[in-house]
């Protein structure tokens, strides 16, 4: 069964009480750490991988015959991400991740389009979302934890066969575990209970850089404040975010005709005031 549960707007309409973000994070982080200390993944299956091989990542309890397995807790790295609470205070959240195979190509940004296969799990092992065959997804439209994990993986190589089929090699493989503050928090979704930490297992096949308004400025560059929210950057205050606005500064000159006319890779700044022409009214 396939669910579609990793998009930001795939939420449950049921009203759930809003918990304090900081307190909820502490509770969930403790649960995640407990899970990681008591579980391992099948790391032996990933030794000496062939370039196009991708065994399924499987989690299991460290008990019985598995008592000597290395816990996930000893293998993960941590990415700290700030999340705003209801009062606009920032609360740091830990995203735990492990890269099994990094990949050999470019890394996506949080704004790019990615071609991935993945599986989403709750801490109890129940799968809520799976794509065995890769699909294209817009990273900026995904829940924060999934979105922030993707740039840690690199794309692989692609080979197109004579019959029109294609194969991927040396693509990135990894998993991430994160609290609900980076997921659905109180809203949950059809298949995810409110306040649920999530696990995503991901294969990063390939990517496309995005320029959503075709103004010659990559969407990631349109995130002027670097907060990975592309809707709150609106230089000319016309209620059209820069990544969808073909005239970012509202001066009547299209951004593509102001951005980098000499093609040196540096945004033009004709008056030398430190503000690029495409964002400068004067």
Enumerate the predicted regions with their spans.
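C-terminal motif of bacterial Sec signal peptides marking the signal peptidase cleavage site
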Residues: 2-5
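Cross-family detector of peptidyl-prolyl cis-trans isomerase
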Residues: 7-282
């Amino acid at each position: 069964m396939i669910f579609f549960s990793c998009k930001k707007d795939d939420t449950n309409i049921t009203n759930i009480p809003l918990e304090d973000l900081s307190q909820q994070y502490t509770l969930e982080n403790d649960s995640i750490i407990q899970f990681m200390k008591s579980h391992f993944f099948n790391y032996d299956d990933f030794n000496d991988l062939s370039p196009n091989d991708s065994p399924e990542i499987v989690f299991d309890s460290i008990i019985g015959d598995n008592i000597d397995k290395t816990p996930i807790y000893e293998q993960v790295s941590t990415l700290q991400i700030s999340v705003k609470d209801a009062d606009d205070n920032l609360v740091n959240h830990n995203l735990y991740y492990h890269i099994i195979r990094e990949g050999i190509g470019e890394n996506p940004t949080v704004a790019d389009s990615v071609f991935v296969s993945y599986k989403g799990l709750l801490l109890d092992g129940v799968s809520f979302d799976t794509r065995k065959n890769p699909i294209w997804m817009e990273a900026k439209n995904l829940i924060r934890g999934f979105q922030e994990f993707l740039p840690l993986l690199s794309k692989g190589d692609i080979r197109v066969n004579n019959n029109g089929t294609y194969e991927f090699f040396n693509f990135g493989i990894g998993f991430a575990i994160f609290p609900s503050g980076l997921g659905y928090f109180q809203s949950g979704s059809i298949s995810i209970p409110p306040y649920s930490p999530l696990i995503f297992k991901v294969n990063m096949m390939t990517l496309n850089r995005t320029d959503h308004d075709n103004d010659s400025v990559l969407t990631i560059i349109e995130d002027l404040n670097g907060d990975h929210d592309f809707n709150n950057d609106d230089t000319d205050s016309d209620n059209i975010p820069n990544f969808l606005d073909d005239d970012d500064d509202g001066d009547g000159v299209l951004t593509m005709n102001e951005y980098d006319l000499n093609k040196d890779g540096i945004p033009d700044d004709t008056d030398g005031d430190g503000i690029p022409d495409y964002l400068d009214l004067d």
